[in-house]
């Protein structure tokens, strides 16, 4: 014991310093080891999140592509076919043309003039209305697809446990998804009467100073079509034309449905209306309509010799020949392809899908 006490007295400072260093070193080792484990856990967590993100992107793209395929191969072709059939039913020019054809030598000049004026109004109404409807319907369905794609992203992310999306609104069920896509028929079923009436008023306003003997050139016809579209779009309340494309928000509430179901479908309609009434969509619609109007007149020019000028009366039968081109099925529809290829349209839908409100 004396030896130990002696050693302690003699080396106490060294022993204390050594013990302190060893203790500190052990503590630092434990802290470093704990920190290393935390870093490793964090790296594994980040790796899992990255893996989940890739799974989300893959599944989202697969399902989104499926929705897009359904829209392109089923929804849009059906909607356009239904639309073109309704236009033919509601704007009948064949009966007037038959009267003119069978009335040669029988009709008095005033009767003949009246029929020709009716044909003038109906032909332009039918052509411009068809062009407007096909253009806007194609854009509308693409808006639908992008909105569904956004909700699909939320659905997939929630299924994989992405916490930052767990507080989103209720998921969109398959029945609501199908109901939403089939609402594209609203234009042909419910919106058509008002659309025809207002488009015809715009045609009458623009053509009231044009006589059947007036000669129209390519530029004059193009200006006439654009003027009709402009008068139609600008007459009435702002974005009045949205009511031709889709049902009102109040109409989406079905008293026989559960509150949850009503909320889900109502949400889709609300988001769609917000997009359609935005300035960005209005700009894209205007660009698309102008592009299609120019293409339509150019097509008529190549087939009729319009470049050198043509009397309005002789132009009317040529206008009727444009109908199959305007309402052709999507795969063969030149106008739909032109719309899809517009840089402004591509950018709009890219931003719409990327920036859908979360």
Swiss-Prot record:
> Where do the coiled-coil regions begin and end?
33-62
Keyword line: Coiled coil, Membrane, Peroxisome, Peroxisome biogenesis, Protein transport, Transmembrane, Transmembrane helix, Transport
Topology within the bilayer: Single-pass membrane protein
Q: Which residues cross the membrane?
A: 15-32
Q: Name one GO biological process term.
A: peroxisome organization
> Where found, per UniProt?
Peroxisome membrane
A Pfam match is Peroxin-3
Recorded GO cellular component terms are:
peroxisomal membrane
Record-linked InterPro entries: Peroxin-3
What is the superkingdom listed in this entry's lineage? Answer: Eukaryota
Keyword rRNA-binding belongs to the record: no
PANTHER family documented for this protein? PEROXISOMAL BIOGENESIS FACTOR 3, PEROXISOME BIOGENESIS PROTEIN 3-1
Q: Which family does it belong to?
A: Belongs to the peroxin-3 family.
What is the annotated role of this protein in its UniProt record? Answer: Involved in morphology determination of peroxisomes, but not in import of peroxisomal matrix proteins. May act as a docking factor for PEX19 and be necessary for the import of peroxisomal membrane proteins in the peroxisomes.
- Name of this protein: Peroxisome biogenesis protein 3-1
Organism, as annotated = Arabidopsis thaliana
